[in-house]
Amino acid sequence: YHIDGFRFDLMGLHDIETMKQIRIELDKIDPTILMYGEGWTGGWTPLPSENSAVKQNIVKFGNMQIAAFSDDTRDSVKGHVFNIAERGYVNGRIGLEESIKFCIVGATGKEGINYDKVIYSRWAWANEPYQCINYISAHDNYTLWDKLYMSNKDSSLEKRKNMNKLAAAIVLTSQGIPFFQAGEEFLRTKKNPDGSFNHDSYNAP
């Protein structure tokens, strides 16, 4: 069917060995097939943490093309995904320079980064940049534009547009695999008729 990529929801619910076997089988068909997922579990799982395909264990895949979404990039650029008022680097929060450096190198180990100051990760969780999915928004949660509005209501329209551009520039110029929600480039909003904003992915305007 010429499917060229596979995304795993809550990839951390899968064990490392299973993910390795999937990658091996995909490589037999076409080594350029993308394979990535959410590097978290979404809650409790009976799977031992050391065997879980979570973000922190991506290093256990060696140089295999298995990537995880970088919440380090997402939240350092725009602010915490679940805190509408919290700002990130592009919308005015200071002290995130090391986190942005970490984004730029695709979550790999490089000199010149103080990993103790990275927003979530205290070490490089990717061996290669292609194991890191750099993104700022996806189908879940608020759009980037809505987040920028809610966290910077006093900023001008032009200033928020510039924040949106800077966010895109960080994703596009960083090492790793860039990922965008459709519409992020034209300031997509999920505004409800009553003026509130919708964060879900199944009932959005």
Task: Please identify what each model-predicted range represents.
Residues 14-18, 160-163:
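Short, glycine/acidic-rich beta->alpha junctions
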Residues 1-14:
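Active-site groove signature of glycoside hydrolases
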